[in-house]
């Protein structure tokens, strides 16, 4: 008896499962049949090239919105903005309405967009020839005739770049959408939301979106009005990369130029250092030229700074040549030092510049050299005439010795004078180096501050 019950229960379970499966299959088959019948009903005689209105005077209201998923690139050189967006579009198609009760309670269906009438909304400022979104997506059609279509699109839109404050710049790029063929009496655009949807936005490493809003407008041509929607994107560059790899090296090069005047003038590396800095700045200028657009309207901030430093370095080379020339002057090169130069560069300026003259200067009073003979070296004694040959020989010998001493003294004084002139000119060169060191350091700091502070203040103000 127990075995019979087990067989009976197993058979009952099998029959119940089969019945459920058959019921579900029948249900699915019924839904598919209803949807198939609905599609045949809706698209029988449907012309996608004809506006789906009851009266020719009716206006199709297209509710339009934009959702941005990625800011791919901002190309300053070619003045392009590349974005990945979704175009939200919704309108009512009077030819696609049905009673859900007649088709198994179906309230909405998915229809390929290429089978429907579309309001042909395109991007006007397109730069790569692709004006429309992707047609490979399906639209949702509701029983009330409402059509919702959200195709993805990748756009390259034209954008006029203002690189005045590069790399602390802000750009305002716009995307203008409108119907390509229908005027305002046939299709009207209505904004779903004035703010661009950024819920699924993927951040860009170089730019951030400060603001993105839409605004409706109308363009009139004769008797016709063409509605459009313009989305404005306010973009701010993140300047960390350019600050670390462009601005800071340029600042370092400018201060290297200042250190040229700290090198001794008798070293041959002063001109080599200045020339190397000038070549490095030229390379940086070529790098910037590859980034920014070629325009004669504005000079970018970093370009102004590089131009300032290049002029700065060029002047330092000219000044260095002059200082080296002063350093190697002497009386033998027919450059006697004027009295005012001595007073200014050897007495006054060193005190103002906190410089000390390390040389010990010796002065020889005029007229200290005796022009008399040996006989004149004995004051208070009466001049006597040698009485013997021995005395006459001794006096002649002493006079020759005195003449030799005077000759040696004159030669030593001349050598000392020449050496003193050489040392004086070298000290003048040191004073000039110290003057230009402070002048160029002050000019470098003030120039950097005056060029970058306004841009930094503007960038920080926009950040807050």
UniProtKB/Swiss-Prot annotation:
Glycans are attached at residues 55, 172. One of its GO terms (cellular component) is postsynaptic membrane. GO terms for biological process: presynaptic modulation of chemical synaptic transmission. InterPro entries: Neur_chan_lig-bd, Neur_chan_lig-bd_sf, Neur_channel, Neuro-gated_channel_TM_sf, Neuro_actylchol_rec, Neurotrans-gated_channel_TM, Neurotransmitter_ion_chnl_CS, Nicotinic_acetylcholine_rcpt. Its main location: membrane. The chain crosses the membrane at residues 239-263, 271-288, 305-326, 435-453. Belongs to the ligand-gated ion channel (TC 1.A.9) family. Acetylcholine receptor (TC 1.A.9.1) subfamily. Beta-3/CHRNB3 sub-subfamily. NCBIfam families: LIC. This is Neuronal acetylcholine receptor subunit beta-3. It comes from Mus musculus (Mouse).
